[in-house]
Amino acid sequence: MTDRQTDTAPSPSAHLLAGGLPTVDAAASREEPKPAPGGGVEGVGARGIARKLFVQLLGSSRSVVAVVCAAGDKPIGAGRSASSGLEKPGPEKRGEEEKEEERGPQWALGSQEPSSWTGEAAVCADSAPAARAPQAPARASVPEGRGARQGAQESGLPRSPSRRGSASRAGPGRASETMNFLLSWVHWTLALLLYLHHAKWSQAAPTTEGEQKSHEVIKFMDVYQRSYCRPIETLVDIFQEYPDEIEYIFKPSCVPLMRCAGCCNDEALECVPTSESNITMQIMRIKPHQSQHIGEMSFLQHSRCECRPKKDRTKPEKKSVRGKGKGQKRKRKKSRFKSWSVHCEPCSERRKHLFVQDPQTCKCSCKNTDSRCKARQLELNERTCRCDKPRR
């Protein structure tokens, strides 16, 4: 091989900077570097290859790495002479190499900051020694001739033993930092995925206590105890308790009271109160267009209840013994009026206290009069017998 062929041969660093990372066999990566015939070390070495594979796995942009490394490196054949093709190291390059060896493994790997983990600086540091590595075999092959120099160039990427040792000391530390970061990143990603998966399922199939109770079957004993005759809270209309106070509007119009309610075991029995008590509540009384105030009103409550036989309300009255005197005549007249009033239907089921019924004709009339409603600037509603606001 001639001098021109050796000068024009592609350098390994140029191939690396072009973007193509080397692919290494698994068996070759476990082999130890072999000594070259012209001196130096043959091959890149297992640790250098592993470092390049880590950079490739991290997915760093090869174009950015190539630009960064090309900006900082010089051509490989810049120091060679045109006539002989041998590299002239010079005193300046030797001084720079000695300074780099004194700086330590971190400068050899090109790490600038402790937080730089992308591995781009490591590739640049590997390419720079690879470009300067042919200096040792070139210097060693001068007395042996061109054959030894050609064998040293064909052996791959030779490196000096001192530089290989510094790289081997710094490589595991850099790789461990990268692996720690990758593991932590994977752990956080898995935790986030598990949280999102759990949140998705919880929204898709919500389970509440109300839905579970809606499908629950209530047992027979619970139904029996709840429906049996007992005092239970009931909403009672105030007008039902105070039928004479028709000039007021009450707020609220009904109050919660404990009243006897429920079922008995026999249809001939009914639930009736056996113990009663009074309770006082504050109710707002409103006189339309006049005044309103909060007053106290007393209501009747049931404390205890029992099932007792029903009273026969349709039972005919016993005939009174005929006798002489005015008292007997009055009783007979009252009984006649009662018998006649039985056939009359009630005027209203809800507001009986607002109507007056004639027992003979069963005609209903209002207790309120039109003049009484006009005195309050209201109008009498004959259908409901209440004083309502005038319509405009």
Curated annotation (Swiss-Prot):
Organ and tissue specificity: In developing embryos, expressed mainly in the choroid plexus, paraventricular neuroepithelium, placenta and kidney glomeruli. Also found in bronchial epithelium, adrenal gland and in seminiferous tubules of testis. High expression continues in kidney glomeruli and choroid plexus in adults.
Keywords assigned: Angiogenesis, Cell membrane, Cytoplasm, Developmental protein, Differentiation, Disulfide bond, Endoplasmic reticulum, Extracellular matrix, Glycoprotein, Golgi apparatus, Growth factor, Heparin-binding, Membrane, Mitogen, Nucleus, Secreted
MF (Gene Ontology): chemoattractant activity; cytokine activity; extracellular matrix binding; fibronectin binding; growth factor activity; heparin binding; identical protein binding; platelet-derived growth factor receptor binding
Bias (Basic and acidic residues) ranges: 89-104, 309-320
Positions of the UniProt region annotated as Disordered: 1-44, 73-174, 309-337
Transmembrane segment boundaries: none
Classification via SMART domains: PDGF
GO biological process: angiogenesis; apoptotic process; artery morphogenesis; blood vessel development; blood vessel morphogenesis; bone trabecula formation; bone trabecula morphogenesis; branching involved in blood vessel morphogenesis
Stated family: Belongs to the PDGF/VEGF growth factor family.
PANTHER family, A to Z: VASCULAR ENDOTHELIAL GROWTH FACTOR, VASCULAR ENDOTHELIAL GROWTH FACTOR A, LONG FORM
UniProt name for this protein: Vascular endothelial growth factor A, long form
